[in-house]
């Protein structure tokens, strides 16, 4: 329906004569409210909802009217004062202050008790004390001269044989650890400290003497060397066979005058 047409809708019939005296105050109130809200949003001031209430709503309406009239943007409510310290927290602080010297006295008593226990332990016999430096000197000599002569290597080999029983115990403990291990990697397993000292590795270094290498590692080393030699021999044989085959093919092709290039390249008789 165009405005020029004679037909009027219900809206046009109802509001054809707007009465400004009735709707003017409502329009001004809504206009001032929108202006105040726009100024408040554009000011980027933090809004504190603690003072929200009937009194706050009346103040908000008053501030919106003043801002709509051209006043400055409404200020945010003042921050609330800090809450008073409760007496319970004061009592806890006093207890902690009192408990600090008592804990120090208890720690001193524990240290004295540990010293008394250490003094009460029986002293080691003289023989054990004398044997330890001898073992240390032996280990130092073996470490200093890894590439020594054969007669010097024999006592170190005997010493290693005598300590085989001592080597077996960490292997048993490692087997127990493997038995107790979970079949799947659990979450957070990397944070746990694992005992890697009892797990013996048999990596063979090129500079390591024979008497210091584990027997299984020596067997593996020899087996790998034998396999390498076999592979080298097989490659040499294959290369020699290929060379002989090519030489025979060239000789036969040159000797036969009826062999064409196609027959030489693509025939099965070649």
Curated annotation (Swiss-Prot):
A motif (ST]-E-Y-X(3)-Y motif 2) lies at residues 260-266. Keywords: Acetylation, Cell cycle, Cell division, Cell projection, Cilium, Cytoplasm, Cytoskeleton, Developmental protein, Microtubule, Mitosis. Its main location: cytoplasm. GO terms for biological process: cell division; mitotic spindle microtubule depolymerization; regulation of embryonic development; regulation of mitotic spindle assembly. A motif (ST]-E-Y-X(3)-Y motif 1) lies at residues 9-15. The keyword Cytoplasm applies. Residues 50-201, 231-255 are annotated as: Disordered. Residues 92-101, 127-144 have a biased composition (Basic and acidic residues). GO terms for molecular function: microtubule binding. Residues 145-156 have a biased composition (Polar residues). Residues 102-118 have a biased composition (Acidic residues). Residues 53-67 have a biased composition (Low complexity). Residues 75-86 have a biased composition (Pro residues). InterPro entries: CSAP. It is found in: Cytoplasm, Cytoskeleton, Microtubule organizing center, Centrosome, Centriole; Cytoplasm, Cytoskeleton, Spindle; Cytoplasm, Cytoskeleton; Cytoplasm, Cytoskeleton, Cilium basal body. Belongs to the CCSAP family. Plays a role in microtubule (MT) stabilization and this stabilization involves the maintenance of NUMA1 at the spindle poles. Colocalizes with polyglutamylated MTs to promote MT stabilization and regulate bipolar spindle formation in mitosis. Binding of CCSAP to centrosomes and the spindle around centrosomes during mitosis inhibits MT depolymerization, thereby stabilizing the mitotic spindle. May play a role in embryonic development. May be required for proper cilia beating. This is Centriole, cilia and spindle-associated protein. It comes from Homo sapiens (Human). The lineage of its organism: Eukaryota, Metazoa, Chordata, Craniata, Vertebrata. The gene is CCSAP.
């Amino acid at each position: 329906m165009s405005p020029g047409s004679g037909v009027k809708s219900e809206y046009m019939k109802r509001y054809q004569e707007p009465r400004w005296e009735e709707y003017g105050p409502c329009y001004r109130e809504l206009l001032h409210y929108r202006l105040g809200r726009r100024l408040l949003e554009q000011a980027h001031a933090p809004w504190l909802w603690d003072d929200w209430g009937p009194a706050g709503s009346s103040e908000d309406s008053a501030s919106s009217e003043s801002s709509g009239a051209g006043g400055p943007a409404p200020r945010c409510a003042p921050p609330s004062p800090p809450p008073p310290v409760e007496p319970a927290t004061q009592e806890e602080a006093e207890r902690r202050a009192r408990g600090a010297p008592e804990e120090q006295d208890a720690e001193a008593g524990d240290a004295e008790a540990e010293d008394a226990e250490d003094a009460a332990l029986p002293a080691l016999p003289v023989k054990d004390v004398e044997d330890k430096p001898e073992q240390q000197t032996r280990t130092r000599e073996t470490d200093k001269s890894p590439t020594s002569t054969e007669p010097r290597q024999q006592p170190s080999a005997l010493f290693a044989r005598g300590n085989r029983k001592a080597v077996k115990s960490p292997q048993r403990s490692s087997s127990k650890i493997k038995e107790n291990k979970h079949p799947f990697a659990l979450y957070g397993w990397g944070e746990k400290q694992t005992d890697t000292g009892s797990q013996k590795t048999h990596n063979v270094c090129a500079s390591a003497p024979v008497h210091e290498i584990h027997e299984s590692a020596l067997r593996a080393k020899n087996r790998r060397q034998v396999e390498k030699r076999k592979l080298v021999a097989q490659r040499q044989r294959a290369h020699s066979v290929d060379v002989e085959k090519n030489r025979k093919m060239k000789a036969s092709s040159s000797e036969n005058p009826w062999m064409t290039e196609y027959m030489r390249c693509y025939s099965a008789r070649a």
